[in-house]
Amino acid sequence: MSWQTYVDDHLMCDIEGHEGHRLTAAAIVGHDGSVWAQSATFPQFKPEEMNGIMTDFNEPGHLAPTGLHLGGTKYMVIQGEAGAVIRGKKGSGGITIKKTGQALVCGIYEEPVTPGQCNMVVERLGDYLLEQGL
């Protein structure tokens, strides 16, 4: 299965039990910042934004004072799982990033999708990739 198929079929799909509700944007990005696959709507990000995200995984709390920036959008960092998941909020939407052995699984949402639904979609794929040694 191609990385693009993972994005299209497992991240940008309808949310279980909520037909028509789906993430706004999603991507799978290598730890080095290289994009493995992304939705057409995923924002173009700067290398320093991805560096900041990777630093926060290695040093939890790094982004808390400044916020998480991706594609020029600033998200307020909310409770995640140290070293495993970073969650951010901006208005009625937000972002979830799950770290696997080799990649970051990213999902961005807006209402009517809820933070919990975004977490479920992103973390389910991230957990699967971890199980596969990726």
From Swiss-Prot:
Binds to actin and affects the structure of the cytoskeleton. At high concentrations, profilin prevents the polymerization of actin, whereas it enhances it at low concentrations. One of its GO terms (molecular function) is actin monomer binding. SMART domains: PROF. Keywords: Actin-binding, Allergen, Cytoplasm, Cytoskeleton, Disulfide bond, Phosphoprotein. It is found in: Cytoplasm, Cytoskeleton. Phosphorylated by MAP kinases. InterPro entries: PFN, PFN_euk, PFN_sf, Profilin_CS. Disulfide bonds join 13-118. One of its GO terms (cellular component) is cell cortex. Occurs in many kinds of cells as a complex with monomeric actin in a 1:1 ratio. CDD domains: PROF (cd00148). This is Profilin-3. The keyword Cytoplasm applies. The variability of the residues taking part of IgE-binding epitopes might be responsible of the difference in cross-reactivity among olive pollen cultivars, and between distantly related pollen species, leading to a variable range of allergy reactions among atopic patients. The modification Phosphothreonine is found at residue 114. Signal peptide: none annotated. A motif (Involved in PIP2 interaction) lies at residues 84-100. Belongs to the profilin family.
